[in-house]
């Protein structure tokens, strides 16, 4: 039995390309996180946090000085993440539909921030202070995004996505409790975030030592 022609809509190449392109934002959201299945995405705060921090890292990676080969590596990774849904779905869309999920691209996408970080680490000292400021601004944003995601997932399992945000009597909870678990996660995440934030502060200026010999 053949599945050919099950999706006649996608026999039209132009329509298929447009539909895949229209799904690009959903693919990006899926890379950031879905809880359970595709009907339970992370809260907007988490998505915005990753957009801001990840986008800043990539833009800075493209902006700093680097060799043509290094810039090409970063650009090819970005093109691979964007182009994979098109290349892998267009030949079979009419038979199986559009089945791509953003998480399928994660093995490639994880290389984007890593390569960008390598390029930034090789940049001149002129951008060092800018990088430090981005890190110190980005860490609190990511902490908020992570805590929001954990809270959202806990709420889904305790009350459902339509349930109360801060109920003290959830339909289900872990042994440590719904809000207790969220609070503990927030505490640990904030502590780790503070350690990273504190480590990224500017190094103290070297003290001037006198070149004069000691009296006596």
Predicted feature residues:
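Membrane-lumen/periplasm interface segments of multi-pass, membrane-embedded glycan/lipid transferases
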Residues: 1-65, 120, 166-186
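Transmembrane alpha-helix segments characteristic
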Residues: 69-92, 141-148, 211-215
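Membrane-interface interhelical loops and short amphipathic "cap" helices
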Residues: 90-100, 160-169
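Hydrophobic/aromatic-rich transmembrane helices and adjacent perimembrane loops
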Residues: 97-117
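Helix-to-loop transition at the C-terminal end of transmembrane segments
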Residues: 1-14, 94-96, 152-160
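Transmembrane helical bundles and short interhelical boundary loops of multi-pass, membrane-embedded
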Residues: 131-216
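Structural signal for the C-terminal ends of transmembrane alpha-helices
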Residues: 57-69, 116-125, 194-201
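Membrane-interface helix-loop-helix junctions at transmembrane boundaries of multi-pass membrane enzymes
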Residues: 59-79, 131-133, 203
